[in-house]
C-alpha cells in the first residue's frame, strides 16, 4: 500500500518535471529547477566569495556562506540548522 502510494506520487512528480521541461527552452533547466525547489543559490558559487554546500573548508575559519557552517568532522560546508 505504501509502495503504491509512493510510486503514484513519484509518477506525478515525474509528470510535472517532464511538462515543465517541455515548456522550458533554457539550457540551464536542471539547475534552475533545483534552485527553485530548494530555494538555495548553491550553484552559482563563482559569483560570491564564500564557499557553498559541499565545498572543502577549514574549521575555525569563516569560509562558508552565512547560511552554511564548516563541519569539524568532514571538513566541508554544510547547511547550518542552528543546533
From Swiss-Prot:
Query: Can you say where in the cell this protein is located?
Result: Secreted
The organism's place on the tree of life at top rank: Eukaryota
Quick check: keyword Disulfide bond in the entry?
A: yes
- Primary localization class, coarse: secreted
Keyword annotations for this protein, in alphabetical order, are: Amidation, Disulfide bond, Ion channel impairing toxin, Knottin, Neurotoxin, Presynaptic neurotoxin, Secreted, Signal, Toxin, Voltage-gated sodium channel impairing toxin
Whether tRNA-binding counts among this entry's keywords is no
Q: Give residues where Leucine amide occurs.
A: 81
Please name every pair of cysteines joined by a disulfide bond in this record: 50-65, 57-70, 64-77
Q: Where is the signal peptide?
A: 1-21
Q: Which InterPro entries match?
A: Huwentoxin-1, Huwentoxin_CS1
Q: Name one GO molecular function term.
A: ion channel inhibitor activity
Q: Which Pfam families match?
A: Toxin_12 (PF07740)
Q: In which tissues is it expressed?
A: Expressed by the venom gland.
Report residue numbers covered by any propeptide: 22-48
Any one GO CC term of the record: extracellular region
Q: Subunit info? A: Monomer.
This molecule's function is given as:
Lethal neurotoxin. Selectively blocks tetrodotoxin-sensitive voltage-gated sodium channels (Nav). Does not affect tetrodotoxin-resistant voltage-gated sodium channels or calcium channels.
Per the record, what about its domains? The presence of a 'disulfide through disulfide knot' structurally defines this protein as a knottin.
Q: What's this protein's family per the entry? A: Belongs to the neurotoxin 10 (Hwtx-1) family. 15 (Hntx-3) subfamily.
Q: What is this protein called?
A: Mu-theraphotoxin-Hhn2l
According to its UniProt entry, this protein's organism is Cyriopagopus hainanus
Amino acid at each position: 500500500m505504501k509502495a503504491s502510494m509512493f510510486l503514484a506520487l513519484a509518477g506525478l512528480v515525474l509528470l510535472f518535471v517532464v511538462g515543465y521541461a517541455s515548456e522550458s527552452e533554457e539550457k540551464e533547466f536542471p539547475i534552475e529547477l533545483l534552485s527553485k525547489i530548494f530555494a538555495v543559490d548553491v550553484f552559482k558559487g563563482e559569483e560570491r566569495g564564500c564557499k557553498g554546500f559541499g565545498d572543502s573548508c577549514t574549521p575555525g575559519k569563516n569560509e562558508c556562506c552565512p547560511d552554511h557552517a564548516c563541519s569539524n568532522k568532514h571538513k566541508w560546508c554544510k547547511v547550518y540548522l542552528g543546533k
